[in-house]
């Protein structure tokens, strides 16, 4: 959430920036959506990780969270994702003005065996052999089916939304908050598994069938790029004070993502390379992201040096912005 709303990577490493009082005053592009109603939906409590602290930066935000719904919680995270989506749809279909909404789901988290609402009997669990699950990064059937249930909930949301007038003029954006450390060797080179890059790898889908043509793109992007891209698609004039970029602006093509780990590493992922540094002791490594990339030792040293400098500069800039990207008056 912090990265999406502020355009700054959460570079604190060992503590969420939303838990740091000095980091809560943040400028966000959401406030440039003038004349838009603004909504936030969460099936549980916004006090978790102090989500509500960062959300206070959004002017006129209408919160729909724990205690707002007639449905009963199914686990510690609150009501089911399906119910949350359908509650949001009830609000959206009543709107007469443009709106910006953030729906934060939580079903694809532990406890996986409690993620699926009992009343959703049309969702059929699938049994898979442990070896097959492991080959594709899943630890057990509960995790696999919770992942599938996320798709089911999105399907129910889209089916409901398509019946309403707002659907044809709305840009839906789906993104994961983080991935899962698992075996990815069936789909990606070994480095993805060895370096736990699956932890950082999430889908990003822009869906607006009446506004956007269908295409699949492979470049490296990150959560900080989402708001500038949405604003660009909506033709909103906005002030960008941080590090995100409009992914559809062909004049700003420089594909990379800065990533951090609670193990004490920072790194930079490009379309071709992954550079990683351990900040606890002097260790830097460079990996190729694809099996077809071949470099000489001299080329590797040059690339590592360049990415090392870039990573250092980006890390320090992100830390500065976390404390200095003030909302203003």
Feature map (PLM): residue ranges:
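Solvent-exposed soluble domains appended to multi-pass membrane proteins
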Residues: 1-329
């Amino acid at each position: 959430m912090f990265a999406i709303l502020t355009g700054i990577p959460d570079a604190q490493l060992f503590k969420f920036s939303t838990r740091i009082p000095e980091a809560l005053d943040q400028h966000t592009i959401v406030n440039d959506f003038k004349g838009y109603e603004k909504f936030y939906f969460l099936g549980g409590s916004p006090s978790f990780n102090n989500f509500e602290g960062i959300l206070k930066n959004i002017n006129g935000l209408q919160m729909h969270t724990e205690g707002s719904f007639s449905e009963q919680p199914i686990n510690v995270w609150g009501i089911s994702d399906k119910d949350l989506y359908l509650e949001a749809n009830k609000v959206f279909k009543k709107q007469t003005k443009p709106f910006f909404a953030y729906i934060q789901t939580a079903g694809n988290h532990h406890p996986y065996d409690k993620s699926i609402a009992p009343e959703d009997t049309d969702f059929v669990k699938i049994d898979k052999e442990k070896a097959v699950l492991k080959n594709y990064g899943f630890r057990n059937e509960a995790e696999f089916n919770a992942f599938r249930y996320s798709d089911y909930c999105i399907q129910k949301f889209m089916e409901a939304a398509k019946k309403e007038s707002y659907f044809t003029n709305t840009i839906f954006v789906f993104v994961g908050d983080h991935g899962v450390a698992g075996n990815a060797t069936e789909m990606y080179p070994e480095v993805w598994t060895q370096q736990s890059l699956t932890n950082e790898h999430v889908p990003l889908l822009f869906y607006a069938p009446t506004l956007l043509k269908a295409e699949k793109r492979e470049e490296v992007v990150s959560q900080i790029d989402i708001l500038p891209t949405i604003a660009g698609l909506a033709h909103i004039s906005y002030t960008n004070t941080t590090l995100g970029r409009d992914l559809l602006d062909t004049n700003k093509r420089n594909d990379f993502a800065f990533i951090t780990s609670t193990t004490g590493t920072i790194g930079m992922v490009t379309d071709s390379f992954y550079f990683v540094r351990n900040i606890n002791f002097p260790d830097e490594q460079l990996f190729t992201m694809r099996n077809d990339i071949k470099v000489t030792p001299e080329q590797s040293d040059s690339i590592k040096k360049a990415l090392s400098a870039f990573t250092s500069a980006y890390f320090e800039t992100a830390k500065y912005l976390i404390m200095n990207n003030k909302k203003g008056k």
